[in-house]
């Protein structure tokens, strides 16, 4: 499972730097002890083969989750292969494979899969990109018939699509709705800058969604021709990973795919280049509906990308990973500085839209007036590396972080879910990504990471950054009175930064531990074991409770959460309004005198995270850790209770980033609609603060928020802590005694307070106009006061699932009027008893009234006729399959245990879920529909501006 460059980037922890001199050696001059010819081995645990007709397959037996197989049909063909009359048809073909095949006519395929618990969208799915189309099918494997049908389905996708004229025309509306959803500011700006980003390439004219004209008017033969030309064995792979023996899966593949014939004169599968250019292309795009300002700098490689084949290639990818780790640590430190130059920024070397070209890319999101400053910062930081290189301290920390992530993957190598494994096999087929297996990779990292020199990493910058093949893209809002950045300003900045002599980065030493004074340990005063749930609850000497569950679901994971009732519900209305937008910035100050950048340095090589929060009805603290870093987690928890820093500069940095992020959110039509509907539903509440804005962020009261935080976290004895994962019980009890029982306990036993305000009820319709694109959306809400009953809550949730099935059938498949539609229902008992049932869908303005009536008609059918047994059985089967998997997930247990106490429910009900599902009947669901879906409802409609 080779860590990709983006995976290395995403896993980066923020660090600071230390200084040494820059070595000027180039990468070519560096000698490696490993062979430049020795090939990267192939994972021996994976069965890879090729049928006589050219189809490739990958198989692995994997028992997590049990009784399930993940199937993928991978087609090495996407929109780049479309001819002019086929633009958008690679993606259209993906749709058609769900709408009629030889063995599953019309909607029978989705109907069958739903009947065995496979949910359309959430489980069953597919995607199309420039160079590939991938079909995703998880299938239950406890029944041989279900497994057989799963293979029949992917075989049908490969060569048995019916593609009748009627089916094609029926699907046009759905695909056009998906096309409509993609319209907006980002799409308009992208269409303008793509010719520069993808200069001279066919990629610029082959976005997978296609063109409206082709989608509306293409001849049936155009689609059939694409299917015939590109859906063929030599361009396909089947991936099968799951809880079935390899021999059985291999035989299934041979039986279903061995008979597919290759065409006699197959069209060559070309690859398409991204030509080099000497010029620097600059694209500056703005739009009045743009929500964010962004800056991108790309340095496209001169040479075409080559897959990693040898040990030397693999080692070089490790060098690139270290470079990405360190440059992003620097950018993250700047993000945390006073007057930050961007909301966030990152850099990495990786792929572009084109299969054959990679690039070094630096990116930042910034304020609407900060584009030049953000661009300057990105250019300077790259130039700083070029002039001075990285330094020894940050290099060592980067190696620790990368090795910690690799070690985590290695420890959990036998606990990885099948749906996380298949992606690597897909990339191996499409991109020739090596897949030697995590055991080999872990050993290789242990062997080679210490041998990588700082000189090797520093040499990369000269390869990455050149004036040719450079593209700079600025996108952002357009509004009256705002001066746009010009191309001349960008060129001037490029020349200026290139001439600057910059100071090297400075590193400041930090302490070994964040705990400076070890707290005096408390004691455990009571143990309670729940054999039914497999949990133990400790009562500590300060009154705090600790519930933990030892699991073997993951070897290197412990999850944690804690709460105490109260939150800002105990504030006055004025205090709530003054602090609500400040609370998120409190932890930015760090703890115990260490700022956030120093903390990140001290946490190098550790897998640990802790997040405190003051919510509306509770104060919470949550996180996760590797078992080896559990003490660090406990130390952080202790410090967030006792020693949160107060730092005006850090808080000011947080406010500036939030203002930059929020500054133009109201320009987005969908966001505007959500905000205005919120005001319509809740605007009369004295505690309703609405959507945060730059003006509201300026009014956030840091002093008051800090004071209130201290009050809310002053009594640890009122908290209940939860831990789930690979726990050493003796260690956890000792750590809880040392770091939790030692916290102040006052015996307060607080409860949240509930205001008298309730959302708007009754029969209402609100129409909100915003935006220029012909896009509308509809929300229908049934809600009001009730008496909470767990059985009714579950029934209303189930009605939402059933109604979603019916709405997809009616609004999408029959009417062709929507791409996505859904319904959700629940009854809550916190902060007060209240039911809510929501329906939402986007559509064309011309279809709003028709589809609204159609949706309400489906609701009425549930009231007058009740759901069918067939639809109820579909939902029940999905519930059962999902629950079976959840019962072996740490995250499920953490959430379930906490919520049982938080919502004051019986935790033992966790074990009664299956009987609860089996007890659902159509008669009872109809009664619930009559009770909750027969009355008033509120309709919100978003339309474009007239």
Q: Each predicted region: which residue ranges?
A:
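Active-site His/Glu-centered metal-binding helix of metallohydrolases
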Residues: 89-97, 323, 582
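Flexible, low-complexity linker/tail segments at the boundary of structured domains
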Residues: 231, 713-714
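Alpha-helical scaffold elements lining the catalytic groove of polysaccharide deacetylases
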Residues: 215-223, 694-701, 705
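Proteolytic maturation boundary segments
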Residues: 21-58, 245-309, 313, 317-318, ...
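Bacterial N-terminal signal peptides that target proteins for export
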Residues: 1-9
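Bacterial N-terminal signal peptides
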Residues: 10-18
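M16 family metallopeptidases and their MPP-like homologs
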Residues: 58-60, 65-82, 88-90, 107-156, ...
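Hydrophobic, small-residue-rich alpha-helical packing segments that form membrane-like cores
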Residues: 167, 172-180, 184-235, 239-241, ...
């Amino acid at each position: 499972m080779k860590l990709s460059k983006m995976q290395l980037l995403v896993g980066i922890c923020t660090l600071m730097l230390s200084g040494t001199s820059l070595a000027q050696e180039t990468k070519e001059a560096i000698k490696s002890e490993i062979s430049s010819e020795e090939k990267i081995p192939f994972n021996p645990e994976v069965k890879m083969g090729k049928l006589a007709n050219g189809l490739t397959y990958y198989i692995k037996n994997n028992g997590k989750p049990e009784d399930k197989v993940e199937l993928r049909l991978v087609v090495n063909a996407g929109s780049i292969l479309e001819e002019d009359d086929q633009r958008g048809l690679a993606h259209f073909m993906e749709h058609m494979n769900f709408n009629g095949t030889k063995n599953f006519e019309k909607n029978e395929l989705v109907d069958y899969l739903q009947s065995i618990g496979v949910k359309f969208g959430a489980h069953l799915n597919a995607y199309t990109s420039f160079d590939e189309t991938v079909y995703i099918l998880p299938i239950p494997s406890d029944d041989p018939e279900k497994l057989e049908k799963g293979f029949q389905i992917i075989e049908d996708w490969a060569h048995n699509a019916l593609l009748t004229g009627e089916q094609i025309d029926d699907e046009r509306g759905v695909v056009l709705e998906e096309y409509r959803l993609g319209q907006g500011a980002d799409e308009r700006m992208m269409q303008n800058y793509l010719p520069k980003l993808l200069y001279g390439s066919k990629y610029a004219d082959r976005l997978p969604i296609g063109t409206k004209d082709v989608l509306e008017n293409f001849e049936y033969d155009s689609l059939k021709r694409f299917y015939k030309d590109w859906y063929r064995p030599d361009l396909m792979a089947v991936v099968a990973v799951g809880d079935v023996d390899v021999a059985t899966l291999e035989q299934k593949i041979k039986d279903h795919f061995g008979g597919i014939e290759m065409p006699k004169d197959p069209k060559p599968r070309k690859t398409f280049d991204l030509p080099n250019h000497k010029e620097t292309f600059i694209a500056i795009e703005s739009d009045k509906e743009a929500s964010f300002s962004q800056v991108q700098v790309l340095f496209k490689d001169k040479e075409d990308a080559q897959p990693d084949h040898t040990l030397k290639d693999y080692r070089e990818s490790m060098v690139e990973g270290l470079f990405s780790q360190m440059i992003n640590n620097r950018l993250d430190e700047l993000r945390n500085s006073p007057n930050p130059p961007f909301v966030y920024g990152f850099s990495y070397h990786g792929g572009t839209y084109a299969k054959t070209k990679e690039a070094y890319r630096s990116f930042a999101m910034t304020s609407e007036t900060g584009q030049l400053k953000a661009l300057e910062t990105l250019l300077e930081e790259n130039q700083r590396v070029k002039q001075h290189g990285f330094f020894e301290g940050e290099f060592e920390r980067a190696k620790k972080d990368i090795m910690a992530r690799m070690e985590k993957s290695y420890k959990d190598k036998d606990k990885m879910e099948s749906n996380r494994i298949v992606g690597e096999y897909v990339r191996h087929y499409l991109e020739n990504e090596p897949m030697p297996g995590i055991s080999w990779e872990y050993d290789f990292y242990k062997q080679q990471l210490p041998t990588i020199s700082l000189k090797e990493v520093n040499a990369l910058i000269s390869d990455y950054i050149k004036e040719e093949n450079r593209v700079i893209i600025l996108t952002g809002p357009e509004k009256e009175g705002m001066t746009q950045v010009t191309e001349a300003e960008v060129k001037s900045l490029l020349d200026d930064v290139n001439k600057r002599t910059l100071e090297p980065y400075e590193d400041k030493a930090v302490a070994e531990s964040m705990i400076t004074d070890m707290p005096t340990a408390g004691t455990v005063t009571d143990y309670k074991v729940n054999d039914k749930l497999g949990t133990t609850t400790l009562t500590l000497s300060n009154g705090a409770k600790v519930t933990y569950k030892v699991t073997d679901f993951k070897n290197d994971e412990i999850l944690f959460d804690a709460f105490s009732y109260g939150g800002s519900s105990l504030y006055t209305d004025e205090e709530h309004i003054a602090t609500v937008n400040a609370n998120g910035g409190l932890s930015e100050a760090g703890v115990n005198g260490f700022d956030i950048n120093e903390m990140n340095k001290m946490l190098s090589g550790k897998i640990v995270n802790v997040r405190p929060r003051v919510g509306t009805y509770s104060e919470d603290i949550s996180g996760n850790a590797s078992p080896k870093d559990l003490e660090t987690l406990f130390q952080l928890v202790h410090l967030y209770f006792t020693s949160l820093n107060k730092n005006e500069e850090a808080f000011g940095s947080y406010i500036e980033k939030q203002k930059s992020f929020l500054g133009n959110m109201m320009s987005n039509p969908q966001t505007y609609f959500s905000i205005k509907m919120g005001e319509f539903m809740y605007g009369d509440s004295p505690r309703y603060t609405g959507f945060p804005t730059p003006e509201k962020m300026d009014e956030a009261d840091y002093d008051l928020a800090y004071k209130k935080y201290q009050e809310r976290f002053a009594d640890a004895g009122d908290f209940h802590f939860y831990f789930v994962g690979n726990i050493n019980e003796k260690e956890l009890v000792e750590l809880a005694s040392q770091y939790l029982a030692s916290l102040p306990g006052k015996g307060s036993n607080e409860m949240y307070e509930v205001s008298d305000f309730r959302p708007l009820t009754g029969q209402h319709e609100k129409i909100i106009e915003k935006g220029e694109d012909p896009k509308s959306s509809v929300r229908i809400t049934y809600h009001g006061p009730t008496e909470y009953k767990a059985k009714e809550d579950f029934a209303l949730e189930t009605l939402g699932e059933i109604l979603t099935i019916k709405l997809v059938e009616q609004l999408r498949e029959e009417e062709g009027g929507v791409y996505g539609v859904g319904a959700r229902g629940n009854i809550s008992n916190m902060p007060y008893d209240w039911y809510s049932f929501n329906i939402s869908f986007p559509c064309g303005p011309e279809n709003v009234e028709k589809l609204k009536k159609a949706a309400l008609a489906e609701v009425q059918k549930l009231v007058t006729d009740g759901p069918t047994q067939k639809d109820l059985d579909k939902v029940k089967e999905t519930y059962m399959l999902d629950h079976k998997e959840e019962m072996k997930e740490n995250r499920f247990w953490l959430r379930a245990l906490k919520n049982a106490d938080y919502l004051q429910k019986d935790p033992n009900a966790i074990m009664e879920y299956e009987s609860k599902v089996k007890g659902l009947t159509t008669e009872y669901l109809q009664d619930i529909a009559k009770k909750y879906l027969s009355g008033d409802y509120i309709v919100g409609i978003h339309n474009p501006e007239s």
